[in-house]
Amino acid sequence: MKEKIVLAYSGGLDTSVAVQWLIDKGYDVVACCLDVGEGKDLDIVYKKALDMGAVECHIIDATKEFSDEYVSYAIKGNLMYENAYPLVSALSRPLIAKKLVEIAEKTNSVGIAHGCTGKGNDQVRFEVAIKALNPSLKAFAPVREWAWSREEEIDYAIKHNIPVSINHDSPYSIDQNLWGRANECGILEDPYAAPPEDAFDLTNALEETPDTADEIILTFDKGIPVQIDGKTYELDDLILTLNALAGKHGIGRIDHVENRLVGIKSREIYEAPAAEVILKAHKALETITLTKDVAHFKPIIEKQFAEQLYNGLWFSPLTDSLKLFIDSTQQYVSGDVRIKLFKGNAIVNGRKSPYTLYDEKLATYTKEDAFNQDAAVGFIDIYGLPTQVNAMLHGGYSNEQ
């Protein structure tokens, strides 16, 4: 009886070729495809996996779990790797790994295979997650093992009659989910080459965007967006709605050269319309609901959290602790944020909260001012005392300094 291998199957080039490759190695292939909001026709994927020779194919709708358990932390934590990348692909990997392990245990498979290359981040993310969840499972990386170029892989697919929606003229590698879309390879590998319009799918070019702005009110409850203009949504539906609306205005295009975990720099094209709008709105709401010390310290945690996720360490004690901290900061991050969507920009022009720490009577310069300006003299004396003592001992700073 042949041993079984669970394959993370997308229906794309790498995993379609991997099915045949694993069969040639003597394994029965159990294909597993997760829907995390990419809008893929899963019936086609299911049929294709079986046509490729898989003995089973499991289709799992994990969109809601993805939004509620993973994207929610990206929002509450304002997660951006290198202040540019909203972790589109990285965010889905721990969930995919979790489901693959569940299928492997259910089918008595000896290991899990993925379609990642040997120079990408995802191989690390999947394999480290698998080790954390079930150390007894083996990891298989066909693409890494055969070490073909993109062109060689396409030629192999054509030779073996493997249908793939890719050719030498359009050799993009695309990954998409609820939170956005990632694109690499082809002309995009030249960091000076302007991305052609066919590299984008979720967003309009600025020249094609409406000449009239849309203004929306995004309502948050404990850090999570729950309404658009007073209409309540589940988080996954809200994100899909915003993707369409913000994408229409060309919002969410990201052209980024990032530092990969494996040590190389990689040029990536991302589209994340909803992510850009939600994160800007969330940050705006935090400016009036977080205390100064929390507002200043939280970005340090956010940076570490983003790096943990990018580096494949979702299932780790540190990440568990970071999640607890992030959750603790969101108790009062509730309220409304008004955002103008226009010509590639998401512009926050208003925010309010029942828990606002902004006191207009303290901030105003009108006669309604409630701030005790007389208290400033004593405050400055105490605050400036260390500076004064240092100057008295060592001499004051000269104009030249």
From Swiss-Prot:
Keywords: Amino-acid biosynthesis, Arginine biosynthesis, ATP-binding, Cytoplasm, Ligase, Nucleotide-binding. GO terms for molecular function: argininosuccinate synthase activity; ATP binding. InterPro entries: Arginosuc_syn_C, Arginosuc_syn_N, Arginosuc_synth, Arginosuc_synth_CS, Arginosuc_synth_type_1_subfam, AS_cat/multimer_dom_body, Rossmann-like_a/b/a_fold. L-citrulline binds at Y85, N121, R125, S173, E258, Y270. Pathway: Amino-acid biosynthesis; L-arginine biosynthesis; L-arginine from L-ornithine and carbamoyl phosphate: step 2/3. ATP binds at A8, Y9, S10, G11, G12, L13, D14, T15, S16, G115. Its EC number is 6.3.4.5. GO terms for cellular component: cytoplasm. It is found in: Cytoplasm. Its main location: cytoplasm. L-aspartate binds at T117, N121, D122. One of its GO terms (biological process) is urea cycle. PROSITE patterns: ARGININOSUCCIN_SYN_1, ARGININOSUCCIN_SYN_2. It catalyses: L-citrulline + L-aspartate + ATP = 2-(N(omega)-L-arginino)succinate + AMP + diphosphate + H(+). Belongs to the argininosuccinate synthase family. Type 1 subfamily. HAMAP family: Arg_succ_synth_type1. Homotetramer. This is Argininosuccinate synthase.
